[in-house]
Amino acid sequence: MIGLIGRKVGMTRVFTEDGVSIPVTVVEVEANRVSQVKTLETDGYAAIQVTTGSKKANRVTKPEAGHFAKAGVEAGRGLWEFRLENGEEFAVGSELTVELFNEVKKVDVTGTSKGKGFQGAVKRWNFRTQDMTHGNSLSHRAPGSIGQCQTPGRVFKGKKMAGHMGAERVTTQNLEIVRVDAERNLLLIKGAVPGATGGNVIVKPAVKA
């Protein structure tokens, strides 16, 4: 399913004709340039590889420079892939723009969530706190029991505990497209999308729409 790579600009709001305020996230989608077309015969699957934005010449590695030169496209800030469905065809060097979403109502947005560092179980997993009084000493935000006794004699894998929070790939599904601004290469998406301002996001037509 083909999507677009964009950059999260921030949030604002737009008004409907009857004065209702809609909170929207602005995603800037510069032209996505096709840098490679993968086929079933040569790669074992059908997909296109795209790049967007720009990268300083001294930041482009030699293998990357050769790859972009072969495709005849300007070096971008990264490389992403979209699987192709039967009948979809693209040429190397062609460009994908926000107009791809002119007829799309709902999208899934994938980004990297904001990193929160090392956090306790209350913030990370929404555990309830223990009693503030009634004899409790120094265990107000402690997680409590983490298992049983001699049987099984271990802590089960996946046990919710304190640890590194955020900075992981997150997808928010079924977000509504409020406006497609082809002139300024902007997508206005209702609600919040994952990640910090300036982060890369992948916008695809919703799978559950």
Curated annotation (Swiss-Prot):
Domain of life: Bacteria
Modified residues (N5-methylglutamine): 150
Ribonucleoprotein is among the record's keywords: yes
GO molecular function: rRNA binding; structural constituent of ribosome
GO CC, any one term: cytosolic large ribosomal subunit
Modification after translation (UniProt): Methylated by PrmB.
Coiled-coil intervals, chain numbering: none
Pfam families the record matches: Ribosomal_L3
Keywords for this protein: Methylation, Ribonucleoprotein, Ribosomal protein, RNA-binding, rRNA-binding
PROSITE patterns named among the record's database cross-references: RIBOSOMAL_L3
A GO BP annotation: translation
Family: Belongs to the universal ribosomal protein uL3 family.
Subunit text: Part of the 50S ribosomal subunit. Forms a cluster with proteins L14 and L19.
Function of the protein: One of the primary rRNA binding proteins, it binds directly near the 3'-end of the 23S rRNA, where it nucleates assembly of the 50S subunit.
Stored HAMAP family: Ribosomal_uL3_B
Name listed for the protein in its UniProt record: Large ribosomal subunit protein uL3
Origin species: Vibrio cholerae serotype O1 (strain ATCC 39315 / El Tor Inaba N16961)
Lineage: Bacteria, Pseudomonadati, Pseudomonadota, Gammaproteobacteria, Vibrionales
